[in-house]
Amino acid sequence: MLNYYSTKRKKKTLATYGAMMKGYIKNNMPNQAIDLFYKIENPDKIIIMFVFNACASLGTSEALDLTKKTLEKMPKTFYSDSYILCSVLDALMTCGDVKYAESIYNSSTNKTLPMYGAMMKGNPLILIIKCINRASTS
């Protein structure tokens, strides 16, 4: 159904792409969500968050590369969005780049509980304890 809709509709909006990407991710089809992402010229916050979620679902080195490239191109204003940061941390941790995730986490001024959870993914126990200790002292 999603594929039929995406091929028949002439002009797609960001909302359309977002709904389709969310559907693909929810139905365990992250590669299709990423394929859609490549078709979008100017993604908004929601689209970028979905591509990070798709990358986290894959957990591959290719997904890590896409996460980093998207992060580089992402407007700096998006860095203050805790939902996007949580998705970035989830993707980085799931794809295995703990150091980069830690640097983003440590530079964030507004740490949220979901961000703590994302940092726990794939992180050795000792690093989790350090994160909790840092959080309690800040």
Placement of each model-derived feature along the sequence:
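Alpha-helical tandem repeat RNA-binding modules
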Residues: 1-138
